Amino acid sequence: MSTEFDYDAIVIGGGPAGSTVARYAAQKGVNVLVIDGRDPIGSPLQCGELVPSNEEMKRLCPDVPDVDDLFQTPDEAISMTCDQMHIITPSGKALKYRFEGLMLNRVVHDENLVTIAKKSGANYMVGKRVLRAEGNTVFLRDGTTLTAKVIVDAGGHNGPIRREYWDEKSTTIPVKFCLMDGNFGDAVELHFGSVAPGGYAWMFPKTGGANIGLGIQRSFAKGKTLNHYADNFISKYNGETTFNGAGGLPMSGTLKSFVKGNFMLVGDSAGMVLPSNGAGITIAMIGGRIAGEVIHEHLENNVPLSTYETVWKKQMGKVMKNSKRSFKIGSLMFRLPNWMLNLLFNRLTKGIVWRAVTCKRMFFIL
């Protein structure tokens, strides 16, 4: 579209958010380049790998259109499917819920998103690190400079544009996890209480193994380290550890604004993680599609880039608002001792707990 710049749009980061931006922009004719320091994209693994099925997403995010077009997960990217989620209280009691989920092979999943974006016409530059962006120019660490009319930061909560141009702070929960061989059943587990202060621990079963880990709020940890909590929790499971990973989840919800001038944030850099359950992959892709489509409309019809924020709020505003509220209430609850949490998590409150996890209003007055 543009002859003044090297590209119409440059996307920093080729994960689910960035590749989805590229896919939807490129299929409408936008000349887009994705730059990612990893090769292959998606490696090393940095998350729990669980996503809702398409039908579950339609229930969780009813204002998001064309879910089946957005989420095209091939069989080879799915380790196993599950139909139950167990919320585990400190006493070990399980509140059981129906939940249709997909346990991913995350690296394969992300590589598939790259393939779809490339087939749509997107360009990729891997193994290259972005140093900074100024105006319409992206500066790489190797000294290369590239220009674009629109520059998107999909590089995570510490992405170069987010870090340089956004002052708004957000709570980031450190996480540590492992992949373990063994047989762990077919129900997703979320554990709450002192096992993971201010956060939660998880066991997500996969074919022949599981993804096991936790995240904490350091202010709740009483001087103990993430490693202390992670090692204690993981040691409860029997199996051979084949991979250890760590990362961070932004848990304050979306920023007040994720467009400044010709800069856009998407995915973790924009806070597109649901605080009440840590869901980020599918949420980032929802934001990525909106951003990609708005970039095309901006270049073609001079639609303001801020339309991205407007459409996001229309599709995800209610869900994010409910999730942020549930996280705040949960943060207060999780300061309580385990015996009180055991009393609060019971058959009478089972529905309220599930509404919090699935980003519905917990109470009709809140």
Which residues does each predicted region cover?
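N-terminal FAD cofactor-binding segment of flavoenzymes
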Residues: 24, 38-85
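C-terminal helical "tail/cap" subdomain of flavin- and related membrane-associated enzymes
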Residues: 293-366
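Glycine-rich phosphate/pyrophosphate-binding beta-alpha loops
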Residues: 46-49, 103, 200, 270-282
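Short beta-strand to alpha-helix junction loop
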Residues: 95-116, 218-225
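Beta1/beta-strand and adjacent pyrophosphate-binding region of the FAD-binding site
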Residues: 2-17
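Conserved mid-domain beta->alpha element of the FAD-binding
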Residues: 254-320
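Predominantly flavin-linked oxidoreductase catalytic cores and closely associated redox partners
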Residues: 14, 40, 116-242, 250, ...
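Glycine-rich FAD pyrophosphate-binding loop
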Residues: 10, 14, 26-47
